Amino acid sequence: RDVAPSRGLGDVYKRQENTYPCLYIPVYQNNNYLFRVTYYRKRINLEVFHVLTDGMGGITFLRELVYEYLRLTHDDLMEKLGDELCSDTSLNKEDSYVKNYTGKKYKKKYKTERAVRLTGEFLPPKALSVTHGYLNIPILKAKAKEYGVSINTFLTGIFAYSIYKEHLHSQPYKKPISICVPVNLRPFYGSITTKNFFGMTAAVLRADKENYTVEEVIARIDESLKEQITKENMDSLISYNVSNQKNLMLRMVPLFVKNLAMKWVYRSSALANTSTVTNVGSLQIREDYRPYIDKMHVVLSMTKGQNMKCSISSYEDTLVYTISSKLKDQSIQKCFFRTLSELGVPVTIETNGEAYEVL
């Protein structure tokens, strides 16, 4: 919403958005910061390199940044609230992976089976198609309940169905549709760290027959995720990652060899997923600031092997499902939102201008 400044901010460096989102951040032209803050009209943007933090940490920082901006531009807020960090803003920077490492051995490996890749004609270099779908949470929750699944599983299932229908044309295929679903590990371990603390799961659909129905796909995705989102599986993820870090033999390997190995691991892991769907949860805003905040979006950048990604964010009674893509073809986006509408979930769509045909 419009925030009219009530005091001068001329001494504060401000950068207006003038490019597509999620472009490369040239560190040496950005004061060596691995994040970038810009604005556009009524919107404040934060772009973060994942090495700094995950979605929860990024949202915590952005929320505190917006709070500070509102206090600076509204004298009544500054007088009432002072110039302190919000009481529920964590400054904890512990390595929760190491803290929760038990040393127990698990037979855990990252999968390397290649998945379906979304390919086609690309948009111009640096261009990114961004489509937001606004959904009413009470209606969406009731519909997901009809299928006996969570909202996250319901939406991931419809996205997998859209890939199956539009990209595979409802035909069998030897490679699986594998959608990476990051899991926030903080609730599992009682952590409040602002550093990265998440685990990777995969919602897998094996297209082994023709004409799957949306109900069948949602059920397959639900089964796939339930097998993985367990405390024991999260323990195994932490154990696998931290044990490699603590392995003395691996620590003695020359850095250039490690770099080559990491590139191979990254490439193998990237090609094992068709896309990503990440849910950053509900944005919690203090009552005093709510009149000034209207909505929140999350946009994911593209990575090797993944030319389309999705993010889910919520504020009050509205959920925003965002699809970012560097492909010209918008058939998957259209199928996704049309399927939701056909199932009785109204959708309001907004795009950045690269995907008008979705409307």
Where in this protein do the model-derived segments appear?
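Non-catalytic, low-complexity flexible loops and terminal extensions
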Residues: 43, 52-60, 64-142, 340-359
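Acidic/histidine-rich catalytic neighborhood
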Residues: 177-210
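Single conserved hydrophobic/aromatic residue that forms the stacking wall/gate
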Residues: 2-13
